[in-house]
From Swiss-Prot:
Record pathway: Amino-acid biosynthesis; L-histidine biosynthesis; L-histidine from 5-phospho-alpha-D-ribose 1-diphosphate: step 2/9; Amino-acid biosynthesis; L-histidine biosynthesis; L-histidine from 5-phospho-alpha-D-ribose 1-diphosphate: step 3/9
Protein name (Swiss-Prot/TrEMBL): Histidine biosynthesis bifunctional protein HisIE
Keyword Phosphoprotein: no
Keyword terms of this UniProt record: Amino-acid biosynthesis, ATP-binding, Cytoplasm, Histidine biosynthesis, Hydrolase, Multifunctional enzyme, Nucleotide-binding
Region (Phosphoribosyl-AMP cyclohydrolase): 1-114
Catalysed conversion reaction: 1-(5-phospho-beta-D-ribosyl)-ATP + H2O = 1-(5-phospho-beta-D-ribosyl)-5'-AMP + diphosphate + H(+); 1-(5-phospho-beta-D-ribosyl)-5'-AMP + H2O = 1-(5-phospho-beta-D-ribosyl)-5-[(5-phospho-beta-D-ribosylamino)methylideneamino]imidazole-4-carboxamide
Organism per entry: Escherichia coli (strain K12)
UniProt cross-references to InterPro entries, sorted A to Z: His_synth_HisIE, HisE, PRib-ATP_PPHydrolase-like, PRib_AMP_CycHydrolase_dom, PRib_AMP_CycHydrolase_sf
EC number of this enzyme: 3.5.4.19, 3.6.1.31
Membership in a protein family: In the N-terminal section; belongs to the PRA-CH family. In the C-terminal section; belongs to the PRA-PH family.
Tree of life domain: Bacteria
Length: 203
């Protein structure tokens, strides 16, 4: 989040009291929308944890999702080098655009976003009927069975690589990724946790 010093250094005069705000998906990096904040909108955003803009058409504070329920939950806020633009990393609840797309800039989603969406779907499957969902059936079978599937798919992936079968390798790697994501969800972990750990190792 913004530090007190960063807030004091924001150049509101340069932006005539309305600062451009770029909102980016905290996980996928997809640019979701552009809005404007005045000091009051920034204060409310920091207090509520939900992105709030100053609407130039309505001439009032406007919390994204206040009508639709598609809120933008704030992860972090950072100023640019000139202190006249803000970058907000957020986790969206539902589509960001009123047209139903994830981004107000159309279908610009990075391929990595699909993994996040798949992860969300797998989390929802925890409460699904095991009779109607393979994923729910996996969860119901317990951690040992899920871990066994990860092991099996790992071996099959390795075997496909040893015979240089790229088609089969792609299929087996997909199965491995799927079951690994299920195992992470089963253990209360997610891709973000793994990515952060990889970043620490890379430093």
């Amino acid at each position: 989040m913004l530090t007190e010093q960063q807030r004091r250094e924001l150049d509101w005069e340069k932006t005539d009291g309305l600062m451009p705000v770029i909102v980016q998906h905290a996980v996928s990096g997809e640019v979701l929308m552009l809005g404007y904040m005045n000091p009051e909108a920034l204060d409310k955003t920091l207090e509520s944890g939900k992105v709030t803009f100053f609407s130039r058409t309505k001439q009032r504070l406007w919390t994204k999702g206040e009508t639709s329920g598609n809120f933008l939950n704030v992860v972090s806020i950072a100023p640019d080098c000139d202190n006249d633009t803000l970058l907000v990393l957020a986790n969206p609840i539902g589509p960001t655009c009123h047209k139903g797309t994830s981004s107000c800039f159309g279908d610009t989603a990075h391929q990595w976003l699909f993994l996040y969406q798949l992860e969300q779907l797998l989390a929802e499957r925890k409460s699904a009927d095991p009779e109607t969902s393979y994923t729910a059936k996996l969860y119901a079978s317990g951690t040992k069975r899920i871990a066994q599937k990860v092991g099996e798919e790992g071996v099959e992936t390795a075997l496909a690589a040893t015979v240089h079968d790229r088609f089969e390798l792609t299929n087996e790697a997909s199965d491995l990724m799927y079951h690994l994501l299920v195992l992470l969800q089963d253990q209360g972990l997610d891709l973000t946790t793994v990515i952060e750990n990889l970043r620490k190792r890379h430093q």
